[in-house]
Amino acid sequence: MAPLLQIDDLHVAVDGAEILRGVDLTVGSGEIHALMGPNGAGKSTLAAALMGHPAYRVTAGTIRFDGQDITDWPTDVRAKAGIFLAFQYPEAIEGVSVTQFLRQAMSARKGDDISVLEVRFAMNEWMERLGMDPAFGERHLNTGFSGGEKKRNEILQMALLEPRLAVLDETDSGLDIDALRVVGRGIHTVRESHPELAVLVVTHYQRILEDLLPDRVHLLFDGRVVETGGPELARRIEAGGYEEWRS
């Protein structure tokens, strides 16, 4: 069986500067992978390139999703195919409620106009499972949200949109230990209902991985994946930093 995500020799440039210099990465359906690396290694660039951000230009290599070459696909087509990106810093949208946003997103994902009643029913079910206040749906999207609330909102989106691959770009940034546990448990709660969901977590830190329990950990350094291992690789990085790869 072909992997869900296969990246081969991917080169990506931003504003004419090459950031990714030949990334190879494979993620199977239902697997959790972590991508670690120092600042400037290209982690967020890879996340943006996977989602088809137009500012991130693929200059060589391929991205295959479920056996199809999606290297040139626009962002909306990738999203409809089942790729989900959780941003490091989600945008606040004044005047648009969480419910309104999710109705539009769910309708686009499923290719059908979903009623407000159907959205509210699905939201209430998942908010109860995720330990969220039902009134959360009436708040304006990410407006005045704490860091933990923004991440809960993204987990709610992930649950309702039912992607096949979720890319979490530094979702642990700025979160305390309790909020990290909420994120980790929330992801596992979603995967209980959708065990085929694959997750690629982009992170600097090993802490969130203690709850997520990744199958594979990849080290991105200077635009390339230079080492792949299990959770022990994350512990090595946490203990000693990146010095052994700088030499």
What are these regions (language model features)?
Residues 158-159:
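ABC ATPase C-loop
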Residues 57-59, 69-84, 237:
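ABC ATPase NBD coupling module
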Residues 36-38:
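The feature captures the beta-strand-to-loop junction immediately N-terminal to the Walker
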Residues 85, 89, 95-110, 122:
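Q-loop/switch helix immediately C-terminal to the Walker
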Residues 5-7, 20-22:
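Conserved structural motif at the start of ABC-family nucleotide-binding domains
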Residues 170-171, 178:
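Walker B catalytic motif
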Residues 216, 220, 224-247:
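Conserved beta-strand-loop-alpha-helix hinge in the C-terminal portion
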